[in-house]
Swiss-Prot record:
BP terms from Gene Ontology: defecation; nematode larval development; regulation of hindgut contraction; regulation of nematode pharyngeal pumping; synaptic transmission, cholinergic; synaptic vesicle exocytosis; vesicle fusion
Domain v-SNARE coiled-coil homology: 23-83
UniProt-recorded name of the protein: Synaptobrevin-1
Organism: Caenorhabditis elegans
Keyword set includes Coiled coil: yes
GO cellular component terms listed in the entry, alphabetical order: axon; cortical granule; neuron projection; plasma membrane; presynaptic active zone; SNARE complex; synaptic vesicle; synaptic vesicle membrane
Reported consequences of knocking out the gene: Worms exhibit arrested development after embryogenesis. Viable mutants appear lethargic with sporadic jerky movements and absent M3 pharynx motorneuron activity. All mutants are resistant to the acetylcholinesterase inhibitor aldicarb indicating impaired cholinergic transmission.
Length: 109
């Protein structure tokens, strides 16, 4: 009985590691799969970070360009406003001179 008991105990322990070993292999395969997925995810996150960085650089450049455009537009607006004022002053001066000439010419007759 002792020999059978020992053999039964060994047989039970031999049968035990095999399913446990299979479970370990399945678990390891799942872990490997998860590691692979996580590596892909990390690569995607790094690519996304790089793209976001490039987008941020573009946005900064665009903001700088918009600011420069705004300054140029304001300067141009002032320039043409003064040109318009000068033209109106010249036209008013011409009208005043014409009125003076007409008054003097009419007064001389």
């Amino acid at each position: 009985m002792d020999a059978q008991g020992d053999a039964g105990a060994q047989g039970g322990s031999q049968g035990g590691p095999r399913p446990s070993n299979k479970r370990l292999q399945q678990t390891q395969a799942q872990v490997d799969e998860v590691v692979g997925i996580m590596k892909v995810n990390v690569e995607k996150v790094l690519e996304r970070d790089q793209k976001l960085s490039q987008l941020d650089d573009r946005a900064d450049a665009l903001q700088e360009g918009a600011s420069q455009f705004e300054k140029s537009a304001a300067t141009l607006k002032r320039k043409y406003w003064w040109k318009n004022i000068k033209m109106m002053i010249i036209m008013c001066a011409i009208v005043v001179i014409l009125i003076i000439i007409i008054v003097l010419w009419a007064g001389g007759k």
